[in-house]
Design a protein with these regions (language model features):
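Active-site gating loops and adjacent loop-to-helix segments of metal-dependent hydrolytic enzymes
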Residues: 78-99, 108-111, 141, 149, ...
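Metal-associated gating/positioning segment near the N- to mid-region
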Residues: 66-137, 212
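Divalent metal-coordination and catalytic microenvironments
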Residues: 26, 41, 46, 65, ...
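Divalent metal-dependent hydrolysis catalytic cores, especially in the metallo-beta-lactamase
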Residues: 102-128, 142-153, 184-197
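Histidine/acidic residue-rich metal-binding segments in metalloenzymes
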Residues: 130, 171-190, 195-215
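Short, acidic/polar
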Residues: 99-107, 167-178
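N-terminal metal-binding scaffold of metallo-dependent hydrolase/deaminase domains
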Residues: 12-57, 66-68
Length: 215
């Protein structure tokens, strides 16, 4: 929301359209100027048409809200996971179809919670890539999803439940190409051990992929 739009005069708009689709009244968070008190936000379809100091005209629907913010971004999600303390155990009990249904539901929850962009960096069966494609086409309700699908790991490495085991430079290069071909918009590698994923044998401070494999 730019400074100019927040100061926009309402005359031209009200003359062109007799009624807005939706007007929101409340505080607006502006990325440049912080919290702006008592603004009118005009919504047409899925876009914000303008932000005004005064009510710009009649509307089919008017809602009073506490705060309108820009869409939030979450850079580390796993849509196939649930919110339990041991989501890997849940994955082991679920079929691929159940995991897909869950991921679709989680995508919808992200949008309903104000998150409009996510980066999904690890999913079984490349489910997040399929969900990302469906969201982009408008087949489901979801945010913009940048998904890696399966992650690239060494044999026995971190997150084996959705890892593509890749040993050596050529194998890693091949795995990257395969993920790109599937539609991955980001590549996730497990360069070290982690703190969750395997019951034994993991050390987050230990290198797994070599420097040559990574670069």
């Amino acid at each position: 929301m730019s400074d100019g739009r927040c100061q926009r005069n309402d005359d031209s708009r009200s003359k062109i359209m007799s009624e807005y689709e939706l007007l929101l009244y409340g505080d607006v968070w502006d990325a440049k100027r912080g919290r702006q008190r008592g603004k009118w936000v005009a919504v047409e379809g899925d876009e914000i048409e303008g932000v005004y100091d005064e009510k710009p005209g009649p509307a089919a629907e008017v809602k009073e809200v506490e705060l309108v913010t820009p869409g939030l971004i979450d850079l580390h999600v796993h849509l196939v996971w649930d919110g339990t303390g041991d989501p890997v155990e849940t994955l082991r009990r679920q079929s691929e179809q159940e995991q897909t249904i869950h991921a679709v539901a989680m995508a919808r929850e992200q949008v309903e919670g104000g998150v409009t962009t996510v980066r999904d960096i690890g999913s079984t069966h490349d489910i997040a890539i399929s969900v990302a494609d469906a969201s982009r086409r408008g087949d489901i309700t979801g945010p913009r999803i940048y998904a890696s699908g399966q992650t690239i790991i060494i044999s026995g490495g971190h997150d084996p439940f959705w890892g593509m085991e890749s040993d050596g430079v050529d194998a890693v290069r091949s795995s990257v190409r395969k993920q790109r071909d599937k539609g991955a918009r980001v590549i996730k590698i497990s360069a070290t051990g982690g703190v969750y994923g395997q019951a034994v044998g993991e050390d987050p401070g230990m290198s797994e992929l070599s420097r040559e494999e990574v670069i």
